[in-house]
From Swiss-Prot:
Residues 201-212 have a biased composition (Acidic residues). This is Large ribosomal subunit protein bL25. Keywords: Ribonucleoprotein, Ribosomal protein, RNA-binding, rRNA-binding. Belongs to the bacterial ribosomal protein bL25 family. CTC subfamily. Pfam families: Ribosomal_L25p (PF01386), Ribosomal_TL5_C (PF14693). One of its GO terms (biological process) is translation. It comes from the Bacteria. GO terms for molecular function: 5S rRNA binding; structural constituent of ribosome. Residues 183-212 are annotated as: Disordered. This is one of the proteins that binds to the 5S RNA in the ribosome where it forms part of the central protuberance. PANTHER family: RIBOSOMAL PROTEIN L25/GLN-TRNA SYNTHETASE, ANTI-CODON-BINDING DOMAIN-CONTAINING PROTEIN, RIBOSOMAL PROTEIN L25_GLN-TRNA SYNTHETASE, ANTI-CODON-BINDING DOMAIN-CONTAINING PROTEIN. Part of the 50S ribosomal subunit; part of the 5S rRNA/L5/L18/L25 subcomplex. Contacts the 5S rRNA. Binds to the 5S rRNA independently of L5 and L18. Gene3D superfamilies: Ribosomal protein L25, beta domain, Ribosomal Protein L25, Chain P.
Length: 212
């Protein structure tokens, strides 16, 4: 992990819907909660615009974050983020404390590379389909990857890349695979465009008819 994210936070005593509305309207902050780690949950308030800017960076969602509560720092991950149903406004955030000695479950983005240069695409006209854009991993906080790279260069036409095909950093496991082989889900594939198979079939039939 190459980036550090620090979120300024403030103790929050007033709770409830009315207090949360005042917080958002008058102070430009949103309510948040920090929980887990064998400690009591801590209600805090954080600057709305600061958080909104931070989440523009994809890495924010797969990093260990630092929440600074007036000098007291907590290491956390973002577990949930609530948004207004139709306005570009954040309404609440949940942060989970992390311990360097305990594994965490985090959704990490998948970065697909060599999509355009893969022979099945460039030479055979295949189309890449993404079944997943992120994957839940299990690891110690210090091993948390910013993203997982999926190289499509060697993927052949009609081949499917599964979770078990992912190349994971040391100390990182795919959560779904811990539940057995039945959970080895597809991640991406390369296939012919719609209509191409039908055209191929018609071409084969025409060749057979010509031979007669």
């Amino acid at each position: 992990m190459s980036q550090d994210f620090v979120i300024e936070a403030f103790p929050r005593d007033d709770q409830g819907k009315g207090a949360s509305r005042r917080l958002r309207r008058e102070e430009r902050k949103i309510p948040a909660i920090i929980y887990g780690g064998g400690k009591d949950a801590t209600p805090v308030a954080i600057w709305h615009n600061e958080l909104k800017k931070a989440i523009e960076n994809e890495a924010f969602f797969s990093h260990i974050l630092t929440v600074d509560i007036q000098g007291k720092k907590e290491s956390v991950i973002l577990k949930d983020l609530q948004r207004h149903p139709y306005k570009p406004i954040l309404t609440h955030a949940d942060f989970l404390r992390v311990d360097k000695d305990h594994e965490i479950h985090v959704n990490v983005p998948l970065h697909f590379i060599n999509e355009d240069t893969a022979p099945a695409v460039k030479l055979q006209g295949g189309i890449v389909s993404h079944t997943m854009t992120e994957v839940e991993v299990i690891c110690l906080p210090q091993n948390l990857p910013e993203f997982i790279e999926v190289d499509l260069n060697e993927v052949e036409m009609d081949q499917v890349v599964h979770l078990s095909d992912l190349k994971l950093p040391k100390g990182v496991k795919v959560a779904a695979l811990q539940q057995g082989e039945d959970h080895d889900l597809p991640v991406a594939s390369i296939h012919k465009p719609k209509g191409a198979k039908a055209d191929d079939a018609e071409g084969e039939e025409g060749e057979e008819g010509g031979e007669e």
